[in-house]
Design a protein with these regions (language model features):
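Conserved SAM/SAH-binding beta-strand->alpha-helix loop
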Residues: 35
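Conserved proline-anchored active-site loop of SAM-dependent methyltransferases
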Residues: 7-21, 54, 64-81, 108-114, ...
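Class I S-adenosyl-L-methionine
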Residues: 57-65, 79-255
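Conserved SAM-binding loop
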Residues: 42
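A short, Lys/Arg-enriched amphipathic alpha-helix followed by its capping loop at the start of a domain
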Residues: 3, 20-27
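The conserved SAM/SAH-binding core of class I Rossmann-like methyltransferase domains
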Residues: 31-32
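Conserved SAM-binding strand-loop segment of SAM-dependent methyltransferases
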Residues: 47-54
């Protein structure tokens, strides 16, 4: 009989990472996030979550566990936002994770972040990622830390999304962890938008669509399937875009209003969800992807319901999430490793 491992989840968001863990051999026994907008969705789909600033939570209030996970805020490191990095107060929240790990001494630590964390520097010029590894290694008894930049589409997520995953085993367990090998080829047809957007009638959240801005409503109908802003006639472009079109070399040939075709794999679903920069236009309909469509691109199952009054906040929580399918593959590899060592 397979053992189930107890997980404490920090910075849980709407529950993408936690869903993947529960689909494997893990139970979430305690979770936390400060963002009010994610609470209802998390509780509806995963379970109870403590809505509180992690800096105000005493470690005595957190149960002992086998695993601690944390998707500490990625915006300060993200290339999709302004890269304030370690100077942004949110960039220091990983130290709160270290505080909890030090007190609870779980067998395994799982961190997740955007690839920008690989190049983010501390104020003294050293790399933040080296600091994180050093802090984990020098706890008592300390952790053997592995991290890798993973492509989500290598593991069955229908999206070209890169994420840095840390997996650290407590040193006294003497475990040499290896990340799972890819499960899907890059040309797997099941990953294309045509397959993902084939949604049965009456699936929850399919009718929830964030309306386009007046400017986008004017421009989007000109864009062909698989096209971009280059399909838009020069005469109807806003003045700002005309200046860019006039000097593409100077502006490094940006791609605005990308509309992927049904035969392509989606680009990265981001928290911003702006059609101009984020490639979230439906292949054939003049609108953003619906909430359900971006959820499917993120590999959330159809029965995972997103709740909230604000559509922009729902798009944001999905864009910030770890794809559950990627999380499950990582979880399975960790469970297998623990059980091979009779832990």
């Amino acid at each position: 009989m397979y053992k189930r491992y107890k997980v404490v989840s920090l910075f849980s968001g709407c529950g993408g990472l936690d869903l993947g863990l529960t689909q494997s051999d893990f139970d979430i026994i305690w979770s936390n996030d400060i963002e009010k907008s994610v609470i209802d969705t998390y509780e509806h789909n995963i379970g109870h979550i403590v809505q509180k600033d992690i800096k105000q939570i005493h470690t005595n209030d957190i149960p002992n566990c086998d695993v601690i996970t944390a998707g500490f805020p990625c915006q300060p490191f993200s290339s999709a936002g302004i890269r304030k990095g370690i100077e942004d107060d949110r960039g220091n929240l990983f130290k709160e994770c270290i505080r909890v790990i030090d007190a609870k001494q779980p067998k395994v630590v799982i961190f997740e972040n955007v690839r920008g964390i690989l190049s983010t520097k501390n104020l003294d010029g050293s790399l933040l990622i080296d600091t994180i590894v050093h802090l984990l290694e020098t706890l008592q008894p300390g952790y053997d830390v592995n991290y890798q930049l993973l492509k989500a589409h290598d593991y069955g997520v229908p999206q070209k999304r890169y994420r840095v995953i840390f997996v650290a085993f407590r040193k006294d367990l003497n475990i040499q962890y290896e990340f799972p090998k890819p499960t899907h080829a890059s040309d797997d047809l099941s990953l294309t938008l045509g397959h993902v957007l084939d949604i049965p009638p009456h699936v929850p959240n399919q009718d929830d669509v964030w309306e386009l801005s007046p400017q986008a409503k004017q421009l989007v109908p000109y864009i062909n399937e698989g096209g971009s802003w280059l399909d838009i006639p020069y005469s109807v472009l806003p003045e700002r875009m005309k200046r860019i079109r006039d000097d593409m070399k100077r502006y490094r040939s940006p791609v605005f209003y990308r509309r992927y075709s049904k035969n392509e794999i989606s680009g990265t679903i981001t928290a911003a969800a702006t059609p101009e920069k984020c490639g979230i236009l439906h292949p054939t309909k003049n609108r953003r992807y619906s909430v359900r469509e971006i959820a499917r691109i993120q590999s959330f199952p159809n029965d995972f319901i997103f709740i909230g009054q604000s559509l922009p906040k729902i798009y944001k929580m999905i864009g910030n999430a770890v794809p559950p399918r990627l999380a499950k593959v990582i979880a399975n590899s960790i469970s297998k490793t623990l059980q091979q060592h009779h832990i």
